[in-house]
Amino acid sequence: MLPENNTLSIRSYEVKKFLCPMGLKYQKIHACPNNCVLYRDEFASLKACPTCGFSRFKKKIDGNSGDEDKDGPPAKVMWYLPIIPRFKWLFSIKEDPKNLKWHVDGRKCDNLLRHPANSSQWKKIDETFLEFGAEPINLRLGLATYGMNPYGNLSNKHTSWSILLMIYNLSPLLCMKRKYMMLSMMISSPRQPENEIDVYLKPLIDDLKLLWEEGINVYDSYSQESFCLRATLFCTINDFPAYENLSGYSVNGHFACPICEKNMSYIQLKHD
């Protein structure tokens, strides 16, 4: 994200002072504790969930006004780090636009699967969407998500779900480096989002749809010209339970395998 030999301060306040003027801000979005809706767009002004009726805010008692309830902090919050300003910033660093064309200019084509660019899925996208595939700078993104306990113990009283984006245009040496792995969203609460994770993904999906359907105007510091940047979600990376949450495909029962589906063979364990 920063030019070579530049580092950020270890103090959070100093980092915010440096990043926010670049447009690299985050959005703090209120959410229903029951994972029904995000309080944005048409729900931005509501004080209770339109689906379950649960209050948007925690209630607190003001000691100066008897027992009158006052709106406290939000009952649940998620953090969204908009991806479009970060992609624009990526193209402002001279070497990065060149690196993003590696899959065309630097990849070895010998029918061996060394990189996602060698896969049949990558080739299928190029053949199906000719205009998109003709521009090597267009982004192919991977989305990864996983729940974790931020306190490092076995307690299930709090979980955090992070949503990461990887850029597969880059070479294997670069695409898994921390610099190019973008934290786009953090969902933190006592309850896991489970199958309602799609509610929280809405801001990210809106940006991805814009990048796919219309594109955004970006200045390429390497070629020193502006162009229309587009992107596609190439794949998702997750464990099997999270696969069900993201795709809606049931991973339980006889047809749990998403590859075999009804053609899967199975053996009942003797003592199961």
Model-identified regions with their sequence ranges:
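Amphipathic alpha-helical blocks
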Residues: 1-10
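Domain-level cores of phosphate- or acyl-group-handling catalytic modules
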Residues: 9-272
